[in-house]
Amino acid sequence: MRRTLLTKAMEMMASGLTPSVAELAEAAEVSRATAYRYFPTQSALVAAVVDESLGPILEWKSESGDAVSRVDELLLHAFPRMEEYEVQLRAAILVSLQQGAQARAGKGGGEEPLVRGHRIELLSSAASPLRDKLGEERFQRVLRALSLVYGTEVFLVLKDIWHLDIEEILQTVRWTAQAILRHASTDD
C-alpha cells in the first residue's frame, strides 16, 4: 500500500500538485486512516517522495581516491537526476519554505518540519580524500563551499535565473567545484 500511495503522490507532484495526506488518500481511493498510517504528515509524504526521487543519488559511491574526481562524479551523477525529478524537488522546496515562513510567523501547525539534508553526507563522502590533508576545520569549510554548488537550489537558480540547460548547468557546477577544491589544496 505504501508503494501505491507513493506512486500516486509522485504522479500528483509531477502534474504540479503538492497533495496533503488527505488529498492523496482521496486520489488513491483509500481511506484517510490508511494514508495517514504510512504518511502521518505532509512533511513525511514529501520526504518520502524526495527520497524516492533521489534514490540513486543517495546510494552514490565512488572508487576513486581523488577528491576532485569524486566530486565531479557526484555532480555528473546527481544533476541529471535532479532534472528528471525537478517538479517533485520544487514541491519539496515549496513545502520547506512554507513551513519556515509559518514557523517564523509563530503559526507553525505542529507538523514536523520537512528536513532535507543528504547534501552534507554526500559531499563529505565525495571530498573525503581531503579530510586528513586539510584537517577538520578546513575540511568543513570546503564542504560548506561545495554545498553552494550542489543541490536542488543551485539547479533551480541556474535553470530559472540563468536559463541554462543541463549541460551548461553541469559545466558551471563542475568548474566551480574544481575551483573550490583547487583553492582548498593550496590555501594556507
Predicted regions and their residues:
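Short amphipathic alpha-helical segment with a characteristic S/N-K-E followed by hydrophobic residues
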Residues: T41-V46
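Short, amphipathic alpha-helix enriched in basic
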Residues: M1-E23, A27
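Amphipathic alpha-helical linker/stalk segments
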Residues: M10-T18, A47-H77
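Amphipathic alpha-helical packing segments from all-alpha helical-bundle domains
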Residues: E84, G100-R144, Q171-A179
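Hydrophobic/aromatic-rich alpha-helical bundle segments in the mid-to-C-terminal region
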Residues: P129-T176, A184-D188
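Generic detection of well-ordered alpha-helical segments
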Residues: R3, T7, L76, P80, ...
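Short hydrophobic/aromatic patch on the recognition helix
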Residues: E29-F39
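Helical hydrophobic small-molecule/effector-binding pocket
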Residues: V71-R104, G110-L114
